[in-house]
A protein has these predicted regions:
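Loop-to-transmembrane alpha-helix initiation sites
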Residues: 31, 144-145, 171, 202-209, ...
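Alpha-helical transmembrane segments within multi-pass membrane transporters and channels
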Residues: 112-153, 311-316
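Helix-loop-helix "hairpin" substructures at the membrane interface of multi-pass membrane proteins
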Residues: 113-114, 118-122, 128-133, 198-275
């Protein structure tokens, strides 16, 4: 007589355990803390705006506004984050924005070169300065913090020397007619306009540049051997070198990428405002580092997230515009910035310790 053996019923808690495991793995991602920060910032300023009787923060135009603000520095934040994951800093990226803008202004307005050529010249010169930064760091072994702190001042001085020797002013206007008729000029000044309740809101090309750079950075970090190299170099340069990773080449390439992103941002700002100013970009280096830290990047290298950095940029954009929409004194922005940075570091450290090994 045949017997039938019943299959053991699945444990009632097994599905729940799998769900918890998935949740833990999601929380173990470097971007988890940044996502929590973004949600928290949005809720806080949504409530403040509501209490102040201004609901603009909750509207689509309001969202376009803070996304545009996030995109501006977000353009340089992704390369800065990758460089930090590799264990290095670039404090010169802010002054590089001003320098590249001045080069564009001088070439286009003073020398009469085509806008597209002026932008390309600025990009090439910026990349050369980035390569010099990287070369000095890898050849001397000096901390990149010190090297780029020095080049920050050198590049800012170069911008001042250029403007004083050519125009005697720190501001150079660029003709809007030439911008609109030039292919690169038209690209960097492009925008999409939307009408909501009779009011026009603009979505500038900077948003698409930011998203494109972030997507490329995320792909490189997560899907290519360069991503493994970047993380390995930041975690242990000696071990990475022993495994055949071209440590010097990786670091120099990242410094060049950071400088290129500064030139891209300078091109956008110069075309948007139809001018160049040596003061433009000042302080952007610290804002970009803040975005990266909020996004989960360790100051010691070897760990971080491009997606988290993008969320960090969004959080700062929300905070900056949320203060405006809530009619709060603008001086509170720096208090909010410091609070977000400290909160993000504490939260990210807790997440790393709590969910270590689950990634």
């Amino acid at each position: 007589m045949a017997t039938t053996v019943a299959e053991p019923a699945s444990a009632p808690g097994s599905q729940r355990l799998r769900e918890i495991s998935l949740a833990q793995r999601l929380l173990a991602k470097p971007a988890a803390g940044a996502l929590v920060i973004v949600v928290f910032v949005y809720i806080v300023f949504a409530i403040l705006s509501f209490l102040r009787g201004n609901l603009a923060f909750l509207t689509i135009p309001g969202a376009l506004n803070f996304v545009g603000v996030a995109a501006t520095v977000g353009i340089i934040a992704t390369p800065v984050a990758l460089l930090m994951i590799a264990g290095e800093f670039d404090l010169s990226v802010g002054s590089m924005v001003g320098f590249a803008g001045i080069v564009i202004g001088i070439c286009a307005t003073i020398w009469g070169l085509p806008i597209w050529l002026s932008i390309l010249i600025a990009m090439v010169l910026s990349m050369a300065l980035g390569a010099i930064n990287g070369y000095i760091v890898v050849r001397t072994g000096l901390p990149s913090f010190i090297v780029t702190l020095a080049t920050l001042n050198i590049i800012a001085g170069m911008s001042s020397v250029l403007t004083s020797s050519v125009t005697n002013i720190t501001f150079i206007a660029i003709d809007r007619g030439r911008i609109s008729s030039d292919p690169l000029g038209a690209f960097f000044s492009a925008k999409l306009s939307f009408v909501f309740d009779g009011a026009t809101s603009d979505l500038f090309v900077s948003v698409f540049l930011w998203l494109a750079i972030a997507a490329i950075g995320a792909y490189v970090l997560g899907r290519t051997k360069w991503g493994n190299w970047i993380s390995g170099v930041g975690g242990s340069p000696a071990a990475a070198r022993n495994l055949g990773v071209p440590v010097a080449r990786v670091k120099i390439a990242l410094f060049v990428a950071t400088a290129l992103s500064a030139a891209i941002l300078a091109a956008f700002l110069s075309m948007q405002f139809a001018s160049a100013d040596i003061k433009r970009g000042g302080g952007y280096e610290l804002t970009a580092i803040t975005m990266a830290v909020i996004g989960g990047c360790l100051l010691t290298g070897g760990y971080g997230s491009v997606a988290g950095t993008a969320l960090g940029a969004l959080a700062l954009g929300m905070a900056g515009q949320g203060i405006v929409f809530a009619s709060i004194n603008a001086d509170w922005y720096f208090i909010a910035l410091g609070t977000l940075l400290l909160s993000a570091v504490i939260l990210n450290n807790w997440i790393r310790r709590r969910f270590a090994g689950l990634r």
